[in-house]
Amino acid sequence: MDTKIGAIDTCKPTTGDIGSPPSNAVATIQDSAPITTTSESTLGRHLSRRLVQAGVTDVFSVPGDFNLTLLDHLIAEPELNNIGCCNELNAGYAADGYARSRGVGACVVTFTVGGLSVLNAIAGAYSENLPVICIVGGPNSNDFGTNRILHHTIGLPDFSQELRCFQTVTCYQAVVNNLEDAHEQIDKAIATALKESKPVYISISCNLAATPHPTFARDPVPFDLTPRMSNTMGLEAAVEATLEFLNKAVKPVMVGGPKLRVAKASEAFLELADASGYPLAVMPSTKGLVPENHPHFIGTYWGAVSTPFCSEIVESADAYIFAGPIFNDYSSVGYSLLLKKEKAIIVHPDRVVVANGPTFGCVLMSDFFRELAKRVKRNETAYENYERIFVPEGKPLKCKPGEPLRVNAMFQHIQKMLSSETAVIAETGDSWFNCQKLKLPKGCGYEFQMQYGSIGWSVGATLGYAQATPEKRVLSFIGDGSFQVTAQDISTMIRNGQKAIIFLINNGGYTIEVEIHDGPYNVIKNWNYTGLVDAIHNGEGKCWTTKVRYEEELVEAIKTATTEKKDSLCFIEVIVHKDDTSKELLEWGSRVSAANGRPPNPQ
């Protein structure tokens, strides 16, 4: 957008000579013409333009009386598309999935009843370091501080409960209830989300969205962020200390962590991998951020449930570089990783810790890796060790005709579907482990929610990711228990012409909970899942459903979904035995159960 600075034309001299007095020889100072406010000069218009400039072209919304006027202004922006969702939780999950692809997402809900419904999704985005802009239509600005009791509140004159909840799961909160500083509040909120890679909360009073104001009268200066820079001396000191440590090591390795995304350092990480010759592994939540066709890629490091032979190489190394790791009870398999801090170089997005010793701050991850790549001594010892012990993975037995389908046989066929034109969304549960074993072709997307692990996340995330990346076909793997939490927004996928392939794995319960701690509460009511989706479809839009029980039926379903139904949303219910789980889930579940069951420390 062009930026117009001031009413310059109104200040020109009345003669043609620059700097000369007017022809009547009396010099006068003329005021700039007053700014005229129009329907273009509104808060809603400013917010919509800012969203587009930040990279958002779709917002996920649920209407409510406090946000209706704001939604009018958002849909009036020609470059912004409104995606109406069935509930606020899914709108938040969709913004999460969208941010994973686009780098930023946005959702719009109404005050408190909508805000507290979307809160769980925003907490998940916070845990996963995703910049999601959560916009809430708030009460009329005249109601603040009046002791009035409003609807959509808990019935107290103080209606700040929503704000206080969001303060714990967002990095910035803007309550816009006057127009004087609204411009600054909105800009600061969006800038903070992008800088911190965390969600922000913006509440906009319902009577302000359409109100013209001089601060919005001109197109804003195009949105931009000042690039962050490393401290030169700190960078040099960090590189020197790291080189001294690495050059003494015999068999160093590299492990990519999920904060590679936050730091935007995947390319720099690969530059170091190319230069060093070290084996290259990823933590489970990093899958998809590092190309698996790299010549030194050895798989997923996940402790006892790692890719075969990966943990042996990582845990036997005498030096490991971890790039943006997150160590929690899930990623550490119940705190059972065999790692030593004194062997680790931990590279955070903005600091480096060398061998549990000195910390070097104000050092950006990408700068650090690029500088290290220029000077590191090549050492392929650990990768050579990997090649010596590596044995190709066996293939599962093929199902006999009429034999019930096994999950491991199913994923052999899923592997053949993957390409640079697909993306994988893995729901919390056994899909985590089965999808981790897929070998991703270059350019194939991959997402799952490792830190927060909220079941049902994948339905909304599939909606958002597919909307952000229409050129890819999303393959989504969802358990029946998870699907029952958020099933409604299949409707939104159909409504918006999406063409994802959803594999609903029906094993009759919450399988991941079964393997941690079993009980009757983990058994769920079986649904007619294809019948449900057919009812949601209701003949409007393109949708195809099928049930499969045998391998030959799965092969036929995949063929149909990828040929004659390639332009439709495809829903494939895969019916498997309730005890058909991956060996990795069995191992992981027992270790997490042991961690959960630790007795209290003695007092």
UniProtKB/Swiss-Prot annotation:
**Chain sites annotated for binding Mg(2+):** D480, N507, G509
Residue sites binding substrate per the record: D65, H152, E513
Cite the record's note on assembly: Homotetramer.
Q: Name its species.
A: Arabidopsis thaliana
Q: Which reaction does it catalyse?
A: a 2-oxocarboxylate + H(+) = an aldehyde + CO2
Comment on bound cofactor: Binds 1 metal ion per subunit.
- Record-linked Pfam families: TPP_enzyme_C, TPP_enzyme_M, TPP_enzyme_N
Highest taxon of source: Eukaryota
Q: Which GO terms describe its molecular function?
A: magnesium ion binding; pyruvate decarboxylase activity; thiamine pyrophosphate binding
Task: Report the gene name.
Answer: PDC4
Q: Does the keyword Transmembrane apply?
A: no
What is the recorded name of this protein? Pyruvate decarboxylase 4
Report the sequence similarity comment from the record.
Belongs to the TPP enzyme family.
The induction comment states:
By abscisic acid (ABA), salt and osmotic stress. Not induced by anoxia.
- Gene3D superfamilies associated with the record: 3.40.50.970, TPP-binding domain (3.40.50.1220)
